[in-house]
Each structure stands twice: as structure tokens, then as C-alpha cells.
């Protein structure tokens, strides 16, 4: 039985965005433009000042494993959106401890709902259609880490957690624009892509908040899943650069991630349903 809640959250309700980076900052700006009272965090005072100069309520917050997180107005919003990715090079136990401190602070501050930005890397590359009903079986360190963080948040009973598993994030400065850029990214060239444009990420998060779709797990990837080789070819045609020689096709294990549940529950239509078309379309102004 689904535990989803589908009421509508008033647009003036406070929301806190933990992590004002590549996704979190434009998300905070978009939510503020929709009428929400938004707080957003950066890890340093200098970073918080930079964000505040954009007209956002900014806070310097760095997750710590050994000490409790100090209280601040940031933590007193009923809705907390966690956009902090796993930290490369940091021990698994330390990252879990950081999230335990985060949960303690959210509980003490009265958070009612949490959205955790996870990843489709929780699914194995085993030729499957990956739906939310499949038990995660990550094989890479990043996927193992986010899977553990998902469980940690879902086990907490003082607030309701929705897990949002994004595919690879693309758009803006995360699009191949030269042969050198393609060469740097030319791993797994003959596998299907599970990606999502940042504009879609922002809109989907807003719909989850607006519709109060809490206590759920959603996958979020573009409808089409082109081979990476074809994606790079589309970029080269649109941007006028020559592709490096990838050699013959060498099929490799991959997965196809389904977003049908998200589209049905949120009545969501992707802005960029086919990654191959992104190079021909300007990015939407989500603000």
C-alpha cells in the first residue's frame, strides 16, 4: 500500500535546502520565485555570503560526524531538502555519522518532511528495467553509500522521507562541447544512458513539495535512454566538433531506469524527455 500524501503545500511555507551547489542553488532560487520562504546552506561563511548576495537566506552549515549540529533558523523549516551528494574520499562510517547528526538536528528542530536526493546508482547494471519495486543492489561505492543513507533517513519516524533517485545530471555546463570533453567522458560508450536535465530536476522537486508527495521513493530519468555513443554524436553535430575514434561497438551491461511511477503520481511531463534533443533546444528559464 502506498504511503504517499497528495495534499497541496501552501507556497509561503518555509523550506530549507541543505546544499547550495550545482542543483541546490537553482532549486532554492526557483522555489523562492514560486513564493516559498527558502533557506539554503553552504559549507563556509564565504559561500553563504555569496548566496546571500543573490537574495536568498543563506546559512553556513558543515556536516560533522563527531559533534552535534548547532541549532539555527535553517533547521526550523518543516520541509528539508537534502541535495548533498556523497563525499569522495571520505570514509563510509564518517558519512553515516554525519547523517546521524543531521537526523538528530532535524528531529530536535521539528522537521516534518524530508526529501533526499539519491541516485539511480543504487541499481545494478544487470540488463534490468529498474523500477522502485526492485531491491537496490549497488556495486559501486557511490551507490552503496547513497543506499545506506536512504535507509538511515527512511528508518527515522519523527519525519516522513521521500527518496528521489536521479539519473546522471546534465544541462548547462554539464554537456559535452568539444572532442576533449567527450574523450574525458568516453567510458562505457556502448551503454544506455539514464540521465536528467537540471531543469527537470528542479521542477520535479517542486512538484513533490507542492503535492506533498511524502513517504515515497521515485526514480527520475528522461524518458529516452540513448546509447552514450549516439549522445556524443548528437553533441558533435550540434556543436561542430569532431568525435574521437571510439572503435567498434562493444556492448556492455547496463540498466534502463523507469520513471513511470513518478510521471503517473505527480502527473509530470518532462521538459527534456530525450537527451538527444537537448543540443537542439535552449534550456528553459526555470525562474
What are these regions (language model features)?
Residues 14-19:
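Conserved N-terminal Rossmann-fold NAD(P)-binding element of oxidoreductases
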Residues 61-64, 250-287:
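C-terminal amphipathic/interface module of NAD(P)-dependent oxidoreductases
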Residues 148-172:
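Conserved beta-loop-beta element that borders a ligand/cofactor-binding pocket
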Residues 165-166, 175-178, 185-209:
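Substrate-positioning beta->alpha
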Amino acid at each position: 500500500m502506498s504511503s504517499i500524501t497528495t495534499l497541496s503545500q501552501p507556497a509561503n511555507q518555509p523550506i530549507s535546502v541543505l546544499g547550495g551547489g550545482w542543483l541546490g542553488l537553482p532549486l532554492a532560487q526557483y522555489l523562492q520565485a514560486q513564493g516559498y520562504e527558502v533557506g539554503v546552506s553552504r559549507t563556509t561563511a564565504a559561500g553563504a555570503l555569496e548566496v546571500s548576495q543573490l537574495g536568498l537566506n543563506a546559512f553556513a552549515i558543515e556536516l560533522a560526524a563527531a559533534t552535534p549540529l548547532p541549532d539555527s533558523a535553517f533547521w526550523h523549516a518543516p520541509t528539508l531538502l537534502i541535495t548533498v551528494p556523497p563525499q569522495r574520499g571520505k570514509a563510509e562510517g564518517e558519512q553515516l555519522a554525519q547523517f546521524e547528526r543531521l537526523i538528530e538536528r532535524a528531529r530536535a528542530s521539528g522537521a516534518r518532511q524530508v526529501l533526499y536526493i539519491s541516485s539511480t546508482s543504487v541499481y545494478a547494471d544487470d540488463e534490468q528495467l529498474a523500477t522502485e519495486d526492485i531491491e537496490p543492489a549497488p556495486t559501486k561505492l557511490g551507490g552503496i553509500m547513497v543506499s545506506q543513507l536512504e535507509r538511515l533517513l527512511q528508518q527515522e519516524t519523527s519525519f516522513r522521507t521521500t527518496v528521489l533517485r536521479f539519473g546522471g545530471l546534465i544541462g548547462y555546463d554539464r554537456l559535452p562541447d568539444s572532442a576533449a570533453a567527450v574523450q574525458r567522458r568516453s567510458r562505457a560508450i556502448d551503454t544506455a544512458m539514464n540521465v536528467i536535465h537540471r531543469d527537470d530536476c528542479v521542477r520535479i522537486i517542486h512538484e513533490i513539495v507542492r503535492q506533498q508527495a511524502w513517504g515515497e521513493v521515485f526514480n527520475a530519468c528522461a524518458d529516452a535512454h540513448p546509447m552514450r555513443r549516439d549522445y556524443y554524436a548528437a553533441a558533435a553535430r550540434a556543436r561542430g566538433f569532431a568525435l574521437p575514434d571510439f572503435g567498434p561497438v562493444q556492448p556492455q551491461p547496463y540498466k534502463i531506469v523507469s520513471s513511470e511511477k513518478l510521471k503517473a503520481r505527480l502527473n509530470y511531463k518532462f521538459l527534456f524527455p530525450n537527451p538527444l534533443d537537448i543540443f537542439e533546444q535552449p534550456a528553459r528559464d526555470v525562474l
